[in-house]
C-alpha cells in the first residue's frame, strides 16, 4: 500500500491532517485503560487512530500525513507508543485542546509554513469505516476535483441509512457536477446532532451524513 501511495500523483500535491486532539478519556467496558476515543482499540489490535493512518496511507505516504494531538496526551504511555511510529516532524502538539476549528487552524499553519502550495485533506481520527476501499476512492476523486479547480472546498457526505441523532448532517443544495462515480453539490448548511424528529426531517429532505472529511487548498 505504501508503494502505491508513492506512485500516486496525489502523493506530491496533497497533505493530510488527522485530528486526534480529543482531551478526555471515553468511558467504556473495554479491558484496556480509559483513553481518548482515537486511541481505543475497538476491533482487533489496532486503535481507531492506527486504522486511520493505515487507511490514508493507501493514498498519501506516511511522511505527508500530519497528526494533531493535545499536549496532555503525551503523558500516557499507550498514546506515546502509538505516536512513536510516525515519521519525524509529523506529530503536531497543541498546548491545550480548543475544539475542532482552532485545531485545524494550528495544523494548517504548521503544514502551510512548509508547503505553501499544497492541497490539504482533513480526516477525523475516530471514525470506524467498514468499506475503506470505497472511502479512499471518493477521497481520491475529491482530490482530483480540487486539482481541476483549486477554488473548491470539498466535504464528503454519505447517504444516510437511518436518522442518526449522534451525527452531523450536510444540507446539500444544487447539483453542480456529476461524474459516473460521484455527484457534487453546493452546501446549503449543516445540522449538528439533531433531535430524532429533526433528523428524520433532514434525512427525508436529502440531508447527508457528514464524514468530516474535507479537502481544499486556499
Feature roles, as predicted:
Residues 132-218:
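Conserved core of the sugar-phosphate nucleotidyltransferase
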Residues 124-125, 217:
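A secondary-structure boundary/capping signal
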Residues 1-36, 41-124, 130, 134-136, ...:
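Conserved N-terminal catalytic core of the sugar/cofactor nucleotidyltransferase
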Amino acid at each position: 500500500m505504501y508503494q502505491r501511495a508513492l506512485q500516486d500523483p496525489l502523493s506530491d500535491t496533497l497533505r493530510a491532517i488527522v485530528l486526534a486532539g480529543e482531551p478526555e478519556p471515553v468511558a467504556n467496558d473495554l479491558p484496556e485503560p480509559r483513553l481518548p476515543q482515537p486511541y481505543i482499540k475497538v476491533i482487533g489490535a489496532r486503535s481507531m487512530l492506527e486504522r486511520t493512518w493505515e487507511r490514508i496511507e493507501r493514498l498519501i505516504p506516511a511522511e505527508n500525513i500530519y497528526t494533531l494531538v493535545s499536549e496532555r496526551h503525551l503523558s500516557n504511555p499507550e498514546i506515546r507508543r502509538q505516536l512513536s511510529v510516525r515519521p519525524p516532524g509529523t506529530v503536531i502538539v497543541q498546548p491545550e485542546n480548543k475544539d475542532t476549528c482552532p485545531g485545524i487552524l494550528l495544523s494548517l499553519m504548521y503544514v502551510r509554513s512548509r508547503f505553501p502550495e499544497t492541497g490539504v485533506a482533513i480526516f477525523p481520527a475516530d471514525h470506524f469505516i467498514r468499506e475503506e476501499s470505497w472511502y479512499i476512492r471518493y477521497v481520491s476523486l475529491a482530490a482530483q476535483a480540487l486539482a481541476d479547480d483549486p477554488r473548491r472546498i470539498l466535504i464528503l457526505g454519505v447517504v444516510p441509512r437511518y436518522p442518526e441523532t449522534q451525527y452531523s448532517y450536510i444540507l446539500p443544495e444544487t447539483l453542480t457536477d456529476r461524474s459516473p462515480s460521484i455527484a457534487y453539490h453546493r452546501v446549503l448548511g449543516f445540522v449538528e446532532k439533531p433531535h430524532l424528529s429533526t433528523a428524520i426531517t433532514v434525512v427525508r429532505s436529502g440531508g447527508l451524513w457528514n464524514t468530516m472529511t474535507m479537502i481544499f487548498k486556499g
